[in-house]
């Protein structure tokens, strides 16, 4: 991303969760080499840490060494750690919108989002989206995105996400999987700088169906789709048995894996690097990362929150911004 300041916009997320405290902890570690501007109500920040208002993300380059750069918003509700106040819903939503506006206008290089509490947004503002990602897709004007979980050890995309396991075979159609593969390939090229990304695709069933003995989807259409897309230039392999795809030697043979359902994708990455996994949304017209955890109401304000995932999300956003192809 040339010509734009390499400053990340960080939306505040749910103020009653751990978002504000891990933002400050991330600033403590990143202030010198990964500047970001926190978008939220400064009253929600830990009182002992310095912050300074900014009116443009580029100002963070001068401010960050001494204070957390803040794009100040005023929230309506009170904040008690661990207890979401629906009156703050409009402020949380505005923080996300402001982050998107800063990135799409070229004033910030990428967007990182702290965790939200969906019920509070529904109760307080009639939030009409299944989640954070769908809201960002609407703001970005796109119909389809994919979720990638990334760490130093693994990049993995679940082809289906928050649906019952019993519904996966119905949702997982050839058109759906083709779209997931296409968006993953494009994201690896455009946002990760890979010129010819290697993608490994798992099977749906145990042992990738074992020739039809343990399921039909692989033989009926998954293998045929992979072969068809190979002829179109995609560097795909599979369908692989998922239980042998995530050990170290196997991971060396691909740049990203596509798994068929939520747990098939998330168990390996959380086993390999639980604290440093990053959620990346591919398919948006801007870079978006987020920490791979929720609001953690149970530990908010107790000095127990681990900022590692947010730190990695900010670092990855910066790296992606430097390598992104327009």
From Swiss-Prot:
TM ranges: none
GO-annotated biological processes: pyridoxal phosphate biosynthetic process; pyridoxine biosynthetic process
Gene Ontology molecular function: 4-hydroxythreonine-4-phosphate dehydrogenase activity; cobalt ion binding; magnesium ion binding; NAD binding; zinc ion binding
Residues annotated to bind a divalent metal cation: 162, 207, 262
InterPro entries assigned: PdxA, PdxA_fam
Catalytic activity: 4-(phosphooxy)-L-threonine + NAD(+) = 3-amino-2-oxopropyl phosphate + CO2 + NADH
Residue numbers binding substrate: 132-133, 270, 279, 288
Compartmental location: Cytoplasm
Named cofactor requirement(s): Zn(2+); Mg(2+); Co(2+)
Description of how the protein assembles with itself and partners: Homodimer.
Known function: Catalyzes the NAD(P)-dependent oxidation of 4-(phosphooxy)-L-threonine (HTP) into 2-amino-3-oxo-4-(phosphooxy)butyric acid which spontaneously decarboxylates to form 3-amino-2-oxopropyl phosphate (AHAP).
HAMAP family in the record: PdxA
Name this protein carries in UniProt: 4-hydroxythreonine-4-phosphate dehydrogenase
Gene source species: Ruegeria sp. (strain TM1040) (Silicibacter sp.)
Highest classification ranks of the organism: Bacteria, Pseudomonadati, Pseudomonadota, Alphaproteobacteria, Rhodobacterales
Gene from which the chain derives: pdxA
């Amino acid at each position: 991303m040339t010509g734009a300041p390499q400053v990340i916009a960080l939306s505040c997320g749910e103020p009653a969760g751990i978002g504000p405290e891990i933002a400050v902890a991330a600033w403590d570690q990143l202030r010198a080499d990964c500047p970001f501007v926190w978008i939220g109500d400064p009253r929600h920040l830990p009182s002992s840490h310095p912050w300074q208002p900014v009116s443009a993300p580029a100002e963070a380059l001068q401010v960050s060494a001494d204070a957390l750069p803040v794009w100040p918003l005023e929230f309506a509700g009170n904040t008690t750690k661990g207890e979401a106040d629906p009156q703050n819903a409009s402020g949380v939503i505005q923080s996300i919108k402001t982050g998107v506006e800063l990135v799409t206008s070229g004033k910030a290089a990428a967007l990182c989002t702290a965790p939200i509490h969906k019920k509070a947004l529904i109760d307080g503002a009639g939030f009409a989206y299944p989640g954070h990602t769908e809201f960002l897709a609407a703001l970005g004007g796109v119909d389809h995105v994919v979720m990638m979980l990334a760490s130093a050890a693994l990049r993995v995309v679940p082809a289906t996400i928050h649906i019952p396991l019993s519904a996966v075979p119905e949702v997982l159609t050839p058109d759906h999987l083709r779209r997931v593969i296409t968006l993953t390939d494009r994201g690896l090229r455009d946002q990760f700088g890979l010129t010819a990304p290697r993608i490994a695709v798992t099977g749906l069933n145990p042992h990738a169906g074992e020739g039809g003995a343990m399921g039909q989807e692989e033989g009926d259409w998954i293998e045929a789709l992979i072969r068809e897309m190979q002829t179109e230039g995609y560097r795909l392999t599979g369908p692989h048995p998922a239980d042998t795809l995530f050990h170290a030697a196997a991971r060396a043979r691909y740049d990203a894996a596509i798994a068929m359902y939520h747990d098939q994708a998330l168990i390996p990455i959380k086993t390999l690097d639980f604290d440093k996994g990053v959620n990346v949304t591919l398919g948006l017209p801007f870079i978006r990362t987020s920490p791979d955890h929720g609001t953690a109401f149970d530990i908010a304000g107790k000095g127990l929150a681990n900022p590692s995932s947010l730190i990695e999300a900010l670092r990855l956003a910066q790296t992606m911004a430097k390598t992104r192809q327009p």
